[in-house]
Amino acid sequence: MDRNGIDGAFALGFGWSDPSLCHMHNDYLIDVQRQYPERFASFATIQPLAGDSALAELSRVAGAGLRGVGELMPHGQGYRLDDWDILDPLVDCTTALGLPLVIHISEPVGHNYQGKGDVSPIAAWQLAARHPHARIVFAHWGGGLPFYELMPEVANVLRSTYYDSAATTYLYRFEVFKIVAEMCSADRVLFGTDYPLLKQGPFLQKVRALGLPEPALNRILGENAVELVGPSWQCRGRATGSDTRF
């Protein structure tokens, strides 16, 4: 991060299927944030299938100061995003706790790759419709969901959601930043790389080379991230953000 001029980052958990691994990983994420409070905003890993235990873990990590939840990975954790009996209580809990929620979404077309999964943009849109007050981040450009925001009824449901750019290199031309910023607003795009899978430096250079207006670039590279987790995150510099996945 220092080498690439990155002031702060979201440290996201992995979507473990074993709740005990989630608990262990969360202990680590709590420790990271406590050691480097100006550099990292940690997001908890949760197994929704754990039911009441998952909700108890949410309360625990919120009490420890973690700033979000995710990345949920339905395809790897054994449930579907439209399993409402499983997801509704968890999303309601994150909303009540004031925690943003990051969810892995897959493209329904295109090439296959390890970890792609089958989490559809349709289910993502339906989830957002069911929880209009939740702060949801659809990872990996939402599996192409922002392009459907040209449909007014889709845009209306998604107006409070965010998209992160993790793994763009493997999915889209980098013009996707400009296109989504124009269609959906730069205020809803979060810079993310999927580090350490992709290195931050080259990714950041490509984004800066796009010629985005400076206000839009500042929103994408950090201002949106700070607003998402709240002003209590005293990120060093408060200008540049990144998505760091451990």
Residue spans for each PLM region:
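Short glycine-enriched loops at secondary-structure junctions
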Residues: 48, 144, 196-197
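Mid-to-C-terminal alpha-helical segments outside catalytic/metal-binding sites
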Residues: 1-8, 179, 183-190, 197-246
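Conserved, mostly hydrophobic/aromatic
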Residues: 1, 29, 33, 61, ...
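Catalytic pocket-lining loop regions of alpha/beta-barrel enzymes
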Residues: 67-68, 73, 81-190
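Short, surface-exposed alpha-helical segments at coil->helix boundaries
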Residues: 23-27, 121, 148, 201
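Active-site gating/metal-coordination segments in enzymes
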Residues: 7-8, 16-109, 113, 171
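Short beta-strand segments
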Residues: 10-13, 45, 137-140, 164-166, ...
